[in-house]
Regions:
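Basic, nucleic-acid-binding surfaces and adjacent catalytic neighborhoods in DNA/RNA-processing proteins
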Residues: 16-31, 41, 75, 135-280, ...
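Gly/Gly-Pro- and Ser/Thr-rich, intrinsically disordered tail segments characteristic of DNA damage-repair
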Residues: 1-106, 226, 238, 295-298, ...
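Phosphate/anion-contacting hairpin/loop surfaces
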Residues: 57-160, 164-173, 183
Length: 310
């Protein structure tokens, strides 16, 4: 999302819109033509497109949304036209948002109503000891909570998705089911910031240091393949809050490098209802969709970073 925001900012900032359509029932009558984009900012996974009339267009990509940039004459290839939710077009570029979520137009002064609940943004330019300490305090506020759930909670730290959740747990040597109290919270926060900052400006999301397809991640989307450290088969299972099973996500782990703490099993706690069973998972390249981003294609350039798994 960070890279998406930077690309949109470079394409739109300071340029008047010749076309500004919002294809959402609540916003269908809004015409942004004539407005000028003053900035495109990101906070965690939220995109904030600020306009010169004192309003902000808020959007969220979730798992399936995307913004694409096109030049005049390009064919729009980001998806079926009925999935287009926003068109912000200048004389030089068109930013087209597909399958956008939480599309809202709010006074810029009220942005905090949309993002005020978020924890420290791991890619905040002002990141330092104060924000890190805030994140540690939020992470340890519920010491018995599973680490894998706490890391994905945007109220703790903003910016971690499923890919980084899996990789952070692996690099800490901690099971996703381990209580937060059993890990070094400061180390977890520092690792999260380091990984996201290292990958912020490139479409390939690598946690291993390798950029070759198939070699970029330690455990994410590698179910059944050999652990790069110990050779054990990478496992995967459902993990989510018991009260919100519809939001369960697949978590990846090495059962040898990340042993489940004594007294806990992957079939207990937050995995109830799924029995913690191993699930089939796509290949690493397919799940991260690295080839979708940052590439100029016939018909346009994807403005977004890899699929919102990070």
């Amino acid at each position: 999302v960070f890279l998406t925001g930077r690309r949109l900012d470079e394409a739109l900032r300071g340029r008047p819109l010749v076309r500004g359509e919002l294809r959402h029932p609540a916003l269908a009558t809004e015409d942004l033509a004539g407005r000028t984009v003053t900035a495109v900012a990101t906070v965690g996974k939220h995109l904030l497109t600020r306009l010169d009339d004192g309003r902000t267009l808020h959007s969220h990509l979730r798992l399936d949304g995307s913004w694409h940039l096109y030049r005049p004459g390009d064919r729009w290839r980001g998806g079926p036209m009925h999935t287009v939710r926003a068109i912000l077009q200048t004389a030089e570029r068109a930013a087209v948002g597909y399958r956008l979520h939480d599309l809202q137009l709010v006074p810029t002064a009220h942005e905090q109503r949309l993002i005020g609940h978020l924890g420290p943004d791991l890619l905040d330019p002002a990141w330092g000891a104060e924000l890190a300490a805030n994140a540690v305090a939020r992470l340890t506020a519920r010491p018995d909570r599973e680490l894998g759930l706490a890391l994905m909670d945007q109220r703790v730290m903003a910016g971690i998705g499923n890919l980084y959740r899996a990789e952070i747990c692996f690099l800490l040597g901690a099971s996703p089911w381990a209580p937060v109290s059993t890990v070094d919270a400061a180390a977890a926060v520092e690792l999260a910031h380091t990984l996201l900052a290292r990958n912020a400006w490139r479409p390939e999301q690598s946690t291993t240091g390798e950029l070759r397809p198939g070699a970029r991640n330690w455990v994410y989307a590698r179910t059944g393949r050999a652990c790069r450290r110990c050779g054990a088969a990478i496992g995967s299972a459902w993990l989510g809050e018991p009260e919100r099973p519809e939001q369960d996500r697949v978590v990846y782990f090495c059962p040898s490098c990340q042993p489940t703490p004594p007294g806990l099993t992957r079939a207990s706690g937050s995995t109830a209802g799924r029995a913690g069973g191993t699930v089939a998972a796509p290949s690493e390249a397919g799940a991260t969709a690295d080839t979708r981003s940052g590439r100029t294609r016939r018909g346009g350039t994807a403005a977004r970073s890899p699929r919102n798994s990070g």
